């Protein structure tokens, strides 16, 4: 069974709201607008210590029942973390017991990535291993290889976000989504914007949305994504 917290991803895909500023207000708004899960973007919130991160998660747990994904994104993968890699990883390890899932990049140093995967397994937390390409969409075999590599590295969910150069790139990603289990796939930007609505129909377990400003190219707002997905049911 694949879950994040109490949310059963085998019953239906989840709308994940990316929390990037004013966390208490954004979490409240996300819940009101139909989000299923919250992604707490420590790197965008300017949180740099384990104590700050833990305090925030405790506050959020006191105000919402939605499950949380802890993310502390590398700059090279679209994030804003400015500290050392050791501190980035240590923060995620230290707050693991307070979250429901953790997102770690496939491109992270293997030993550091393995530390997060090991800790998540010990704490019975869901592990998302993610990869982002903001320039292009690789060929289908490479897309599958990246997802397989993430699963081999210990991912419960392999997340892949790529930038299409044409509609064939978008179709290729959707076809791979249909073929590989337990994935989250996103075709970014204007060309791929619709995949945030339809990729779940092909097997994507998660689809990400914003509460205010988009944190990734082509990201829709929670309420708009919720309405669109309900139309597809």
UniProtKB/Swiss-Prot annotation:
Pfam families: DHquinase_I. Keywords: Amino-acid biosynthesis, Aromatic amino acid biosynthesis, Lyase, Schiff base. It catalyses: 3-dehydroquinate = 3-dehydroshikimate + H2O. Pathway: Metabolic intermediate biosynthesis; chorismate biosynthesis; chorismate from D-erythrose 4-phosphate and phosphoenolpyruvate: step 3/7. SUPFAM superfamilies: Aldolase. The active site is at 132 (proton donor/acceptor), 159 (schiff-base intermediate with substrate). One of its GO terms (biological process) is aromatic amino acid family biosynthetic process. CDD domains: DHQase_I (cd00502). 3-dehydroquinate binds at residues 39-41, 73, 196, 219. Its EC number is 4.2.1.10. GO terms for molecular function: 3-dehydroquinate dehydratase activity. Homodimer. Involved in the third step of the chorismate pathway, which leads to the biosynthesis of aromatic amino acids. Catalyzes the cis-dehydration of 3-dehydroquinate (DHQ) and introduces the first double bond of the aromatic ring to yield 3-dehydroshikimate. Belongs to the type-I 3-dehydroquinase family. This is 3-dehydroquinate dehydratase. The lineage of its organism: Archaea, Methanobacteriati, Methanobacteriota, Stenosarchaea group, Methanomicrobia.
